[in-house]
């Protein structure tokens, strides 16, 4: 069985790919990367609606790539962003309603 690369290794490879393709230069507008992310989210939603696991896997991966590149364009790492989100949600109170977790301030 083929072993998957860890997320940190993949982030480094994606960063090198993005740099090689000019996505990390000062002339690039991060807003364009955000538009690419929205496109990929749409494709991911389509895969989910049509119950296509292979396309869903690809879509989720594409979204992660877009987020990694967007973070790097702003001089941040995906780990830094994820840690900030974790610190915000780890003690969050709320409840599950209709399959979604709603924080207590939204109830």
Q: What is each residue range found by the language model?
A:
Residues 1-60, 64-107:
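Flexible "arm" and connector segments at domain edges
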């Amino acid at each position: 069985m083929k072993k998957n690369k860890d997320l940190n290794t993949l982030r480094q490879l994606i960063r090198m790919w993005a740099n090689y393709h000019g996505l990390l230069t000062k002339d690039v507008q991060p807003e364009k990367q955000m538009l690419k992310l929205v496109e990929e989210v749409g494709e991911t939603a389509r895969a989910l609606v049509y119950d296509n696991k292979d396309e869903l896997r690809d879509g989720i991966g594409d979204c992660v790539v877009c987020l990694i590149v967007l973070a790097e364009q702003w001089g941040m790492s995906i780990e830094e962003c994820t840690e900030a989100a974790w610190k915000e949600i780890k003690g969050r109170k709320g409840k599950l309603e209709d399959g979604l977790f709603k924080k207590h301030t939204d109830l």
